[in-house]
Design a protein with these regions (language model features):
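Short glycine-rich, flexible loops that bind phosphorylated cofactors or substrates
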Residues: 4-5, 66, 124, 157
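Histidine-centered active-site/metal-ligand motif
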Residues: 2-5, 64, 92, 130, ...
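Structured loop/turn residues at beta-strand edges in well-structured enzyme cores
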Residues: 16, 36-39, 55, 76, ...
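Di-metal (Zn2+ and/or Mg2+/Mn2+) metal-binding site signature of metallo-dependent hydrolases
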Residues: 1-17, 25
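Cap/insert and terminal regions of metallo-dependent hydrolase folds
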Residues: 20-22, 26-29, 89, 97-183
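Helix-loop-beta element that forms the nucleotide-linked donor phosphate-binding surface
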Residues: 31-45
Length: 183
């Protein structure tokens, strides 16, 4: 539920035009405060799924934390997502440090056609919350992805690295291991 992933003004603007908000457990409390109708909120815990119109959303583990301030740290669930249709499998990492969970997710839910992986806003001291570009590429390999898309870079300045370093480094590492990517 960090501000760079859950924006109050955006939700207020779109809430009447979105039929369903599929969110991790606890995030529904924010949505209800922002006047999203209860029947439009689906909250999931890790390894729970919701299917609508032949599209399945599965809430999966990530290595991160939640909170919109110091008083509500870890009061909602952080997660990643597998999104599957009869035609494509997509993985979205959300914010996550690198870990064994990527291999497990790949084994249980993959392989994926496209994996959108956190590669920005990193610092070696934050390795349990955000991946380095090289780790994002390792995660893509663990997931068994066909195409890797580096995400979570270039939107907000939260780390000291140069603006476009995350995507440039990710592409460099992807090329080294023969991984196809989308930018």
């Amino acid at each position: 539920d960090h501000y760079d992933h859950l924006d109050h003004s955006t939700i207020k603007r779109i809430k009447d035009n979105v039929n369903i908000f599929v969110v991790p457990h606890g995030v529904g409390n924010h949505l209800r405060k922002w006047e999203v109708k209860e029947e439009n909120i689906i909250e999931l815990n890790w390894n729970e799924s919701f299917e609508k119109d032949n599209i399945e959303f599965t809430c999966l583990p990530a290595r991160h934390f939640s909170g919109r301030g110091p008083l509500n740290r870890n009061s909602t669930l952080w997660c990643s997502w597998a999104i599957k249709s009869p035609f494509v499998k997509i993985y979205f990492s959300g914010d996550s440090g690198y870990g064994k969970h990527f291999k497990k997710i790949g084994d249980e839910h993959g392989p994926f056609n496209i994996s959108l992986l956190d590669c920005g806003q990193y610092n070696k001291a934050w390795k349990y919350s955000h991946m380095l570009p090289s780790e994002a590429v390792l995660a893509a390999k663990d997931l068994g992805t066909e195409f890797f898309m580096p995400i979570h870079w270039g939107g907000f300045t939260l780390a000291m690295h140069p603006w476009d370093e995350p995507v440039e480094e990710s592409i460099k590492f992807a090329d080294k291991v023969g991984l196809s990517y989308l930018t």
